[in-house]
Amino acid sequence: MAPTTDATADESSMPGKTVGAAPDALFTLTAELGHAICAGMTGRAGGVSQGPWASLNLGDHVGDDAAAVAANRARLAGALGVRPVYLRQVHGCTVVPIDRHTPDGVPADACWTTDDQVACTVLVADCLPLLFAAPGAASVAAVHAGWRGLAGADGQGILEALVQTWPAVRSAAARRATVVWIGAGIGPRHFEVGPEVRAAFVGAHADDADAFAPSPRDPERWLADLPALARRRLRRLGFEHILGNDGTASWCTASQPSRFFSHRRDAVVFGSSGRMAAVIWRR
């Protein structure tokens, strides 16, 4: 079956019990992952950046004024009460542990921690953020999952690397008890990809074919349902409690310009786009 086609998104609300009005204006989405866990995702409002980065751009690699980015990051840290640790994301499969001594800029696309003084943080503007709370809230993790990292090579991507690297989820029982939240990302109506993207998934798992629909614009291209592909990978790895993004329009970054940054939407017009942060930390 083809992926669900987005309708026009209603930017005034987001669906599901896993999200709600955040207590701080910087957050567009909050994730309910347990009483000892704080987690959520920023939107584009609440910062000081101008132009295509207006206003809460948290990416320091997209051409925005460095002072504005620093001010935005300071606002986020103040809202959290802990330090967000920013990775240098490379669309790869590297997972690193972090603590209060970890500097920003470590090259990786996922991180985990047991330290309650830092927040696992990933930056996104169409790619999916995935936040994980391990059993007992003893450890948390954040993953940046674009199609390259999700697909990986020969079916071994960023989620497989997380399972192999993060001690809290190495056992099947722990994965069954872990809660995962998928944040906002580009929806299936807007994520047009080439045949090589489809092949990267279908070559490893033939049943992923129904997460792709032919593009009505180009017969040689496809519309990919990235949230569905992420959920399938998670279930194959034994994660059962998966909340958040279900691929419907109200979770789509590309269709909600007042709420979210979108690289695909904005870069073709402005030459750049801001970045949002998905964060998770232990109380």
How would you label these PLM feature ranges?
Residues 1-283:
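Active-site microenvironment for binding and transforming phosphate-containing groups
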